[in-house]
């Protein structure tokens, strides 16, 4: 167990609490989607317990939406609407190999089953009425419509945001100076909060390195904090040209800003920092970013590594508030094409990107530090 000061521990716990309050509306969004897709009815028709694949078949949603359904059900199980049980003979059909989680109705979700199918009076009409604002609000970004949408062969994997608005969040930021400023200010505030704790409690992760490149580092909040703490460290911030154009002109002497694209190339350095970046991208996109990072750093023996600051879902499964916050934030990210990953999901993309070893340190509350080695 890593020991940190009581002040830092309280700040990290307060961060989780605020994040939970901020994104708790995603539980209502998940419930609205469950009602729209008639998930409780689907499980009821399977005898009260069903795997994801079985639910998918019952509700008539395409198999490519299975990961999205998993994320909806993860929120609804953590919040207690459904529960996960051991596979039974009924659920271990030819459709399942016994490794899929099996979702069971609880007393709460049994009240979502339609009255025609259940002896218990259904509350679905009442909840449909109460939750209707979430269907029409940008807060949900048309998640139900996304589940029902047939994938376009010309644009596979389109996220709910793009389906609703016809563009990506990043393109909106590029075109709209006000939204770009709002986003950059939000990321800078997060960096100021997190780096204060990181450099106070865990500064050793930056010891013994000569150069660092902060990939998609925005206006440089994290990098400038690191550079101030380590004046001999040569630091580079890489981001898109329209982002670095808004960087402060009076930056610290050992920090430079470079306009570029992480999907094309990354400036060379001993260490690459990816703070809260990879969760915005699909597995394939993360693998491409990580391969470019690998080309930018030396071997492990020569001090090369990647420092990732991101969520590892289930990093402390004993903390129910933390876990709930991680999964409801993951559902929020799903709307823009992002994803929060558990350790096995992280490991998969690390190996596919050609890395040999990694170390996860769940020491930043909601997020963890991951050191990744070539």
From Swiss-Prot:
- What general EC class does the enzyme of this chain belong to? transferase
Q: Which residues form the active site?
A: 279 (proton acceptor)
| Any GO BP | biosynthetic process
Q: Which InterPro entries match?
A: COMT-like, O_MeTrfase_dom, Plant_O-MeTrfase_dimerisation, SAM-dependent_MTases_sf, WH-like_DNA-bd_sf, WH_DNA-bd_sf
| Tissue localization of expression | Expressed predominantly in root hairs.
Cited Gene3D superfamilies: Vaccinia Virus protein VP39, Winged helix-like DNA-binding domain superfamily/Winged helix DNA-binding domain
Residues holding S-adenosyl-L-methionine? 239, 261-262, 275
Pfam families given in the database record = Dimerisation, Methyltransf_2
Q: Which reaction does it catalyse?
A: (8Z,11Z)-5-(pentadeca-8,11,14-trien-1-yl)resorcinol + S-adenosyl-L-methionine = (8Z,11Z)-5-(pentadeca- 8,11,14-trien-1-yl)resorcinol-3-methyl ether + S-adenosyl-L-homocysteine + H(+)
Q: Which UniProt keywords apply?
A: Methyltransferase, S-adenosyl-L-methionine, Transferase
Q: Which is an annotated GO molecular function term of this record?
A: 5-n-alk(en)ylresorcinol O-methyltransferase activity
What Enzyme Commission number(s) apply to this enzyme?
2.1.1.n7
Outline what the protein does.
O-methyltransferase involved in the biosynthetic pathway of the phytotoxin sorgoleone, a potent broad-spectrum inhibitor active against many agronomically important monocot and dicot weed species. Substrate specificity for alkylresorcinols. Strong preference for a five carbons alkyl side chain.
> What's the subunit arrangement here?
Homodimer.
Task: Give the protein family.
Answer: Belongs to the class I-like SAM-binding methyltransferase superfamily. Cation-independent O-methyltransferase family. COMT subfamily.
What protein am I looking at?
5-pentadecatrienyl resorcinol O-methyltransferase
Q: Which organism is it from?
A: Sorghum bicolor
């Amino acid at each position: 167990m890593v020991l940190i000061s009581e002040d830092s521990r309280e700040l990290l716990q307060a961060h989780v609490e605020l994040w939970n309050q901020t994104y708790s509306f995603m539980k209502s969004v998940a419930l609205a989607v469950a009602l729209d897709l008639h998930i409780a009815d689907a499980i009821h028709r399977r005898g009260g317990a069903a795997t994801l694949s079985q639910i998918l078949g019952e509700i008539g949603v395409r198999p490519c939406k299975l990961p999205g359904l998993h994320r909806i059900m993860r929120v609804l199980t953590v919040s207690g609407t459904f529960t996960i049980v051991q596979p039974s003979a009924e659920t271990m059909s030819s459709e399942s190999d016994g490794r899929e989680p099996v979702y069971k109705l609880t007393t709460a979700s049994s009240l979502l089953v339609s009255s025609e199918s259940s002896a218990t009076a259904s509350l679905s009409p009442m909840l449909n009425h109460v939750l209707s604002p979430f269907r029409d609000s940008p807060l949900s970004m048309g998640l139900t419509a996304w589940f029902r949408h047939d994938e376009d062969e010309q644009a596979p994997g389109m996220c709910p945001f793009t389906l609703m608005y016809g563009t990506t969040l990043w393109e909106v930021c590029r075109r709209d100076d006000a939204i770009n400023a709002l986003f950059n200010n939000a990321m800078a505030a997060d960096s100021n909060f997190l780096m204060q704790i990181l450099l106070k409690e865990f500064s050793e992760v930056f010891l013994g390195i000569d150069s660092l490149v902060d990939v998609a580092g925005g206006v440089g909040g994290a990098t400038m904090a690191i550079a101030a703490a380590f004046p001999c460290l040569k630091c580079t911030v890489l981001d898109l040209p329209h982002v670095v154009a808004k960087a402060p002109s009076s930056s610290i002497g050992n920090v430079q800003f470079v306009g570029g694209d992480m999907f094309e190339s990354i400036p060379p350095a001993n260490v690459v920092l990816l703070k809260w970046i990879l969760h915005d991208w699909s597995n394939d996109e993360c693998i491409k970013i990580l391969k470019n990072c690998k080309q930018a750093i030396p071997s492990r023996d020569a001090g090369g590594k990647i420092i990732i600051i991101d969520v590892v879902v289930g990093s402390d499964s004993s903390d129910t508030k933390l876990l709930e916050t991680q999964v409801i934030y993951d559902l929020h990210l799903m709307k823009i094409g992002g994803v929060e990953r558990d350790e096995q999901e992280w490991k998969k993309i690390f190996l596919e990107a050609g890395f040999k070893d990694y170390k996860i340190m769940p020491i930043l509350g909601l997020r963890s530090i991951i050191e990744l080695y070539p």
